[in-house]
């Protein structure tokens, strides 16, 4: 008989793989569970036990990480990023992103696209900078 811990670790690995393949498709957690051949409650218990987070939180973390990467590394308009990430429109994407990060996608992009520390120049001045 297989070790229960190893089985749970394998299910979590398979879940993460499915998330990687389908996070842009906005699957419901029950669909991931069905694909894994288990029920929603078992998937939820395994994720909480192994990661401290629910399956939905793990999916949203992956989607948020991809959104941040695209905002940081592409000049694409929000509408395009929203479409690429499976949102029906830029407004829904903005709402999701703001709920997850406490800032709008535009504000996030403005912060991460500044040259390093540009906004901190005034704060760094010390006695040596005096005339």
Which residues fall in each region the model found?
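Terminal helix-turn-helix DNA-binding modules in bacterial transcription factors
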Residues: 49-90, 107-131
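Core residues of bacterial helix-turn-helix
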Residues: 36, 85-86, 97
């Amino acid at each position: 008989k297989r070790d229960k811990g190893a089985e749970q670790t394998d299910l979590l690995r398979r879940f993460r793989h499915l998330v990687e393949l389908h996070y842009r498709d906005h699957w419901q957690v029950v669909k991931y569970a069905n694909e894994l051949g288990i029920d929603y409650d078992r998937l939820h218990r395994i994720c909480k036990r192994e990661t401290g987070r629910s399956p939905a939180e793990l999916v949203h973390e992956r989607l948020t990480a991809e959104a941040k990467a695209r905002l940081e590394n592409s000049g694409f308009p929000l509408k395009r990023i929203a479409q690429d990430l499976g949102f029906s429109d830029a407004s829904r994407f903005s709402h999701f992103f703001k709920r997850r990060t406490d800032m709008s996608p535009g504000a996030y992009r403005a912060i991460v696209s500044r040259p390093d520390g540009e906004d901190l120049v005034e704060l760094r001045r010390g006695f040596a900078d005096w005339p």
